[in-house]
Amino acid sequence: MKHFFTILGGLLLALAGGAEEPEFYVGACTHFAQNKGTPSQNLEMAAHAGIVSIRDEVSWQRVERQKGKLVIPDYFGKYLDEAVKRGIRPLIIFDYGNRFYDGGNYPASDEALEGFARYCEAIVRYAGDRVKLYQVWNEWDGGCGMRGYGRGTPEGYVKLLKTVYPRLKKIAPDAIIISNSVCTGEKFLENTFRLGVLDYCDAIGFHTYNYTLLHTPVEAWFKRMQNLRKLIHSYNGGKDKPVFITEMGYPNHLSNSGSSEEESAIKLARLYLYARTLPFLKGLYWYDFQDDGWNSAHNENNFGLVRADLTPKLPYFAMKSLAARLSRAELLESETRDGLLLLRFRNGKEQFLAAINQRPGVDLQLIFTDTGSSRDALTLELVGSAPLTRSWGFRDWTARKAEVIPNQLSVTVGEMPLLLSGNVEKVRLTEVRPHAFDRTRLVKTAGLRLPAAFAEVLPAGETAQTMPFGTYRQLTDSRYGGLNDLSAGFRANYTRDALLLELEVKDNVFHQPETAIETAWKGDSIQLAFQCIGAPFSVRTEIDAALIGGKPAVMVRAAQGDRSRVPQCRIERRGERTVVYHLTIPARLFGLKAFDSGAMLTGSLLINDNDGNGRKGFLSWGSGIGIHKDPGLYNLFIFK
């Protein structure tokens, strides 16, 4: 079956106001504004890899350091110049609060909105022709860069964008203004659509991280993007709206959610090739260009295409194989056959083929036929590897056939996509032969990670040991005052049908300003996360509980089993300082029939702390919840 596509490159060219712009922005995120990396060296390597755009920032706080006085920092112009002279197009983010307006919170007052707009205007005027791509905020919905202020609302963001967009277009009518990079999913994005965000931007920003869903193939991302297009059509009169994926990546940290360099390279290659089949996608920015540090267990230190000292990683070479090609290429044809996706691109006057194997556990042998008469040798390139020359002629010697077919060529594609270039205009796919090759059966060295702590879960009626919460994570400038500020302990028992938890919290100030359990994490509350031993990384059970308006409230955020089995929750106040949470959590919620002696669960427990000025931190037993979701950092529950 064949499908033919015409890439809507003209739409983007019209937006960008110049024929020199790429068909597609193959980009990478940098952190020059955070004083990370060396712009000249980083950008030289980015250009060598064929990357045509970088995404960086110059924050409001750095520009307006005295109220009413806007001064563009020198580093901004320097990294712009370094990028532009290498043919790299910067995408610049306008972001984050300023302490002179609304106390540093999300800009909402008229004064703050005006201040933010002035800052944006100053950046656009300063950048001039060096920048055509701008994004109004980064992860407004996720709280990035806004420590202590929680997450922004759809209403607040659309109000901001309505203020800023027309003023920027007046200064730079050819600029492409991209909306906030939504990171919490389609629900928030759709809420902004309802509020009219599509009328106040030239393109939609979206972040699509799924690396914590360890067994999720790139094809699931591709399906998600197709569904995103349908969502846009439903609010845009059945028409496309350009979309930029301004962050996507697979970090190489040593954790259950980490990918090996080889896995990241494979995912990168498949991701960019799939992206080029979607005409509404105008750019995809890999996060990150450079590792942020050397901590092998920390995701942010291991997202890069290159190490912290610029040593290339395997994904860098995959990017080098594809970036220059895909940024200028036009998709001519897409063919699917027997689990193969074969893409035919035109880049200038030449064509090239890209083969993607979509069948897990199988390698695909591809037989090509030259229907012309040239028999020119072709260039074969496994993405990320050195190209080599292949001449025509195929002998099926494994089937004991002696004859050579002079106008045929055989290549095999596994997980990593494969490229064929040269005189391929009259080259056609003749046959696809599957060969079983299940890489999940490869014997690999297994690492053993022992939990940092464990708790015994005793049968109901027996006195369980009280386990203290020992780690406080500070999120704002308000310092943790020790045990007199916040302390907690828990006991765990069980019946065959349920896990029984009692958490006793002593807090010098109890404050819960929220009216809904979904956002109760912003105030004094608890969050629990569990995983059954041997479960896939992405499958876990998460529970929130809080005292809201004097009444207990509980919700299930995620479940390994029957989500309708909501835990019973009783919360009691003991004087001014003590709150006790009693939870009965059904075994069925974990996907278990019953709890028995010898059973084990991994899990983490968290106490949120708000003394009246926002969520200032949390106390935890175990990690992997509160900042990043990582069941590999949970502690252990042992049922006695």
What are these regions (language model features)?
Residues G9-G18:
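Hydrophobic h-region of N-terminal signal peptides that target proteins for export
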Residues Y250-M319, E335-R337:
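Aromatic/acidic polysaccharide-binding cleft in carbohydrate-active enzymes
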Residues I54, A83, I123, Y134, ...:
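Conserved, mostly hydrophobic/aromatic
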Residues F394-F437:
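C-terminal beta-strand-rich structural cap/linker in extracellular carbohydrate-active enzymes
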Residues T336-G384, R577:
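Carbohydrate-binding surface patches
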Residues E20-A122, Q135, D141, G470-R473:
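N-terminal substrate-binding region of glycoside hydrolase catalytic domains
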Residues R433-K640:
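Structural preference for beta-rich elements and adjacent junctions enriched in aromatics
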Residues N35-T38, E64-K67, I72-Y75, Y101-K230, ...:
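Active-site cleft segment of glycoside hydrolase catalytic domains centered on the general acid/base Glu
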